[in-house]
From Swiss-Prot:
Gene3D superfamilies: 3.30.70.260
Signal peptide per UniProt: none
Protein name per its UniProtKB record: UPF0250 protein HCH_05838
Membership in a protein family: Belongs to the UPF0250 family.
Species this chain originates from: Hahella chejuensis (strain KCTC 2396)
Top-rank taxon, per record: Bacteria
Matches recorded under InterPro entries: UPF0250_YbeD-like, YbeD-like_sf
Length: 91
């Protein structure tokens, strides 16, 4: 089997799953993201968010982890985050 044919590593659920959300900096961006995340992970603690402004202050990067239950759980959260107009990228 070549490197290109190797399967991606399997994630064992439930697990702590790190996320990074980048969006347009605004007074409520962090709270909007926390609200979306809480809809999928009610135990999420918004005080665990690590926020970093871009050099020019236009964007805000939020890093945090959730307790992911399945690949579908992560996929639904990604879709809801990406659907918000202020969110530019979800990693």
């Amino acid at each position: 089997m070549t490197d290109s044919q190797k399967e991606a590593p399997k994630i064992e659920f439930p697990c702590d799953y790190p996320l990074k959300v980048i969006g347009v900096a605004g007074p409520d961006f962090q709270e909007v993201v926390a609200t979306i995340v809480r809809a999928h992970a009610p135990e999420f603690d918004a005080s665990s968010i690590d926020a970093l402004d871009s050099r020019n202050g236009k964007y805000l990067s939020l890093r945090f982890s959730i307790q992911a239950q399945s690949e579908e759980h992560i996929r639904r959260l990604f879709l809801d985050l990406k659907a918000h107009s202020a969110v530019q990228m979800v990693l």
